[in-house]
């Protein structure tokens, strides 16, 4: 893993990535801003499950990835889940920016 990925892994461990559930006191509505489904809270786990981010694909099953891999002692598992988070967070930022631009 590179330094950027190590920093992301630390942020995931410490629940510091920018999702509403990590900063509950700052938000009255914890709904995912990407899928806007009131049944899904904006959490780290939901990022790996959000149908809008995944485009309907079940990447977790395909790559045999688990959210708990961020806490694993297996560096390969950690690296795989961090790379997936990197891609999904990047896609999330892109979607949020496109929506802001469209407003």
Stretches with model-predicted labels:
Residues 1-103:
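Family-specific functional microsites
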């Amino acid at each position: 893993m590179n330094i950027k990925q190590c920093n992301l892994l630390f942020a995931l461990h410490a629940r510091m990535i920018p999702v509403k559930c990590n900063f509950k006191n700052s938000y009255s509505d914890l709904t995912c801003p990407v899928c806007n489904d009131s049944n899904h809270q904006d959490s780290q786990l939901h990022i790996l499950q959000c149908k809008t981010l995944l485009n309907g694909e079940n990447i977790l099953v395909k790559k045999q990835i688990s959210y708990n891999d961020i806490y694993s002692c297996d560096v390969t598992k950690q690296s795989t889940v961090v790379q997936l988070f990197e891609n999904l967070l990047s896609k999330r930022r892109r979607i949020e920016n496109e929506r802001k631009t469209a407003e």
